[in-house]
Each structure stands twice: as C-alpha cells, then as structure tokens.
C-alpha cells in the first residue's frame, strides 16, 4: 500500500536536516526571513482579531479566531520564514551534535528580534490603515483589552501557558513535515494552531502583534473611551500599557516557549 505520509522517524530526520540549515543561514537572510515570519504571524493575529472582536461569547470568539489565525503559520511553511517558536526545535540538532549551542542561540536571538521587527511593521500598518476603526472603534478597544490582559499575566501563568502553546506549535510543524502534499500540510497546521488559540495559550511572536498594537491603540482617545465603556477598563490599566510592563509578558512567555522544545527531544 502506498504511504501518504512520512513516518515519525522520517519526520524527525527531515526536521533535523532543516534545523541544521536554519542554524547555518547567512545573517542577512536569517534577518529577512525572520522579519517575514513576524509579519505573517501578525497578519494572522490582525485578521483573527477582526473576525472575533464583536463576538460576546468568549468560547465562540476564540473558536472564530482559531479558524483564522493558523493562516500565519501556513504562509510561513509555504512561502518561507524563520519563526522563533518553530526554531526552538533546533535544540534537537544540538542534542544530535549537528549544531553547536552557540549556533542555536545565535539563530534564536537573531530570529526573535527579526520577528519583532516584522510584527511591528504590521502593527504600524494596521493602525494607520483604519482597521481598528471597525464597529465604531470597538476593534481598537478590543486591541487595548487584549493587550491589558497580556501585560497583566503572572510569571507562572506566562511560563506554563507558553509551554502549552509551543508544544502545539511544534506539533503543527512536525505534522506539516509528516504530510506529503499541500492539503495535508494545511490541515496538519490548522488543528494544533487552532487548539492553542482556542485554549488561549501564550505565543511570544503573536504577542509581538497583540501587545504593541494595543499600546498604539491606547494613544487614541476614541478607542480608550470605547475600551472603558465596553470592557470596564480603568485609566490606570490602560496607562500600564508600556514597553516596561510588556516585559511582564514577553519574558515568561518566551521562557515557556523555549522550554516546550524539550518535549520534542528524543
């Protein structure tokens, strides 16, 4: 019988070869691909927020967002891009002695900040495009609410939610490698990524969209007034949307995302 997917051992071997290539990319190409991936994930975040922002039921809103958000990773897989959370799997190559710790850490640092640049580009374009004006500015208020919730997360919740999130992201990437055709890869990516969005788990690169766009929206008095009216946010909570407070999310979530890669080591 013809086999329509790669076996687990073939998946690991293929992914390790890809990881070795990622670690040895020229710096300029690594930065460019990192910017692309950050932008693609941010586009997934922007479109999923647009689809879900006016839905009152939390479960339904997350389900709708979960249907849309996976497009970001799909674009990365098919078009190309270096995504920090996916590149955490390079640790497999370190364990297999294909890549050094220095090469792994260099890649993760460069890709992390390149993802941030890409996400910030989309954040800026979204704010100037008028996208946040949807539903009388409710989308802008929603962006503020989401950002406030994220910067208020506790370190323990950030780490554990980050672990849960990137387990699913790594599974999506490995399942996409297992699939041998485009349709199979689409569905392989879709379900694990939808699961992490519906679960409300924390993804550091996605948060490079959600937190900065909320900070930008908080500079618009119309969005601020709408956020206070619709979501009961206080002026103090909104004023807490600062770069310093964003580290309350980015540091523990990034740690959690990195720790989850250990689940893929054989």
Predicted regions and their residues:
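Alpha-helical transmembrane segments and their helix-helix packing motifs
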Residues: 1-266
């Amino acid at each position: 019988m013809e086999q329509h997917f790669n076996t687990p051992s073939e998946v690991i071997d293929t992914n390790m070869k890809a990881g070795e290539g990622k670690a040895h990319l020229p710096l300029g190409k690594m930065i460019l691909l990192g910017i692309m991936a950050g932008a693609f994930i941010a586009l997934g975040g922007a479109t999923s927020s647009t689809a879900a922002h006016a839905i009152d039921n939390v479960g339904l809103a997350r389900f709708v967002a979960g249907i849309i958000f996976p497009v970001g990773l799909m674009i990365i897989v098919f078009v190309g891009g270096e995504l920090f959370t996916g590149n955490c799997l390079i640790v497999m190559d370190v364990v297999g002695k294909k890549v050094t710790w220095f090469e792994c850490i260099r890649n993760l640092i460069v890709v992390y900040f390149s993802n941030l640049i890409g996400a910030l580009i989309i954040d800026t374009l979204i704010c100037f495009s008028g996208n946040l004006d949807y539903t009388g500015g409710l989308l802008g208020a929603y962006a503020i609410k989401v950002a406030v919730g994220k910067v208020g997360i506790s370190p323990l919740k950030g780490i554990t939610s980050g672990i849960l999130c990137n387990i699913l992201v790594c599974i999506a990437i490995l399942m996409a490698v297992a699939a041998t055709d485009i349709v199979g890869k689409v569905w392989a990516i879709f379900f694990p990524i939808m699961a992490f969005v519906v679960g409300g788990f924390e993804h550091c690169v996605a948060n490079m969209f959600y937190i900065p766009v909320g900070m930008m929206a908080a500079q618009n008095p119309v969005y601020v007034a709408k956020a206070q009216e619709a979501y009961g946010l206080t002026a103090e909570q909104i004023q807490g949307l600062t770069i310093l407070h964003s580290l309350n999310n980015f540091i523990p979530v990034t740690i959690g995302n990195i720790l989850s890669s250990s689940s893929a080591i054989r």
